[in-house]
Amino acid sequence: MGNLSTPKSVQKLQTALHAKAKAEAGYRFYALYDKTSREDVLAHAYAQCRSNKGAPGVDGQEFADIEAYGVQRWLGELALALRQETYRPDPIRRVFIPKANGKLRPLGISTLRDRVCMTAAMLVLEPIFEADLPPEQYAYRPGRNAQQAVVDVEALLFSGHPEVVDADLADYFGSIPHAELLKSAARRIVDRRVLHLIKMWLECPVEETDDRGRKTRTTEARDNRRGIPQGSPISPLLANLYMRRFVLGWKMLGLERSLGTRIVTYADDLVILCRKGKAEEALHRLHEIMGKLKLTVNEEKTRICTVPSGEFDFLGYSVCCRRRKERRATANGVVKLHER
């Protein structure tokens, strides 16, 4: 979000929420909905969405349209809809983005109104759930990034974890079960109106346009009761919230100690670093736990790698570990770890 700074009033709110969550692990927040419609929160949410730019949703509305109408007027109407509980999200416009491997990745584009509302909710909820996320999770978190995740993977390889379960989850975002995700949210959030907002966003219809310009709408997320749309402002937070279940489950079962393992996750990218001779058992337990979470391990893409004889890719980095590494950018800008 560039140099966009958070207003002091919003910072104060976020600091108080985070401090309360950090101090009381069992505390459940009961009065949050009104905070999402606060003038300062909505204004900052709009500024964030504006700085991120992005294409219009199904209604075709662009930021220029809002500014011509009057931002304060537009935000005031959104705040009123939230307070009167008449707000309803629009369908999500689905587009397909080419991936490096030639396949297409679905991306959900919400309307600007919904993006601002989701961002406002994220501004309120993120400080609470951030207090609960374990250090093994690196994605979408303040002060953490992909390079830190790779650096820590490298450090673990050098500290006696030479076997790696390089895991791939089949359609993680599209597979997250709504009921279980909402249970994870309700562990901290009592405010039924906030939970209802999340539920509405999860169940949004999806609109696609074919090559002939014909539009079709589906309700697969609501019908299947699973999946969070990639591309929405609140999806990263929800994805982290559900992955937390796996990380905590692994620890609660004593697998970190008994198998000598360490986990590093970045969204749906996951590696389990193991003591020698423990990777096979770790892979078995991975399948077991993910099955209980109603997630699927992609067997074709999940493998065991032993360093220094092998290497694996993680977050656009090629990791190999025969000697100390140096980092350099390749021609396409992807940074890799190479042997010195």
What positions do the PLM features span?
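Non-catalytic, polymerase-adjacent accessory regions of viral genome-replication enzymes
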Residues: M1-Q72
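Short alpha-helical scaffolding segments that buttress acidic/His motifs in well-ordered protein cores
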Residues: A45-C49, A120, L197-L202
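Short beta-strand-to-loop capping motifs
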Residues: E67, T111, I272-K276
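Conserved polymerase palm-domain catalytic core
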Residues: W74-E77, A81-F96, A100, D132-V307, ...
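Glycine-rich active-site/cofactor-binding loop and its immediate structural neighborhood
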Residues: F96, N101-S110, M118
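Duplex nucleic acid-engaging cores and interfaces of nucleic-acid transaction enzymes
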Residues: L112-M122, A146, V150, E154
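Electropositive, glycine- and tryptophan-enriched low-complexity nucleic-acid-binding patches
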Residues: T119-Q137
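Active-site and adjacent loop segments of nucleotide-processing enzymes
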Residues: Y317-R340
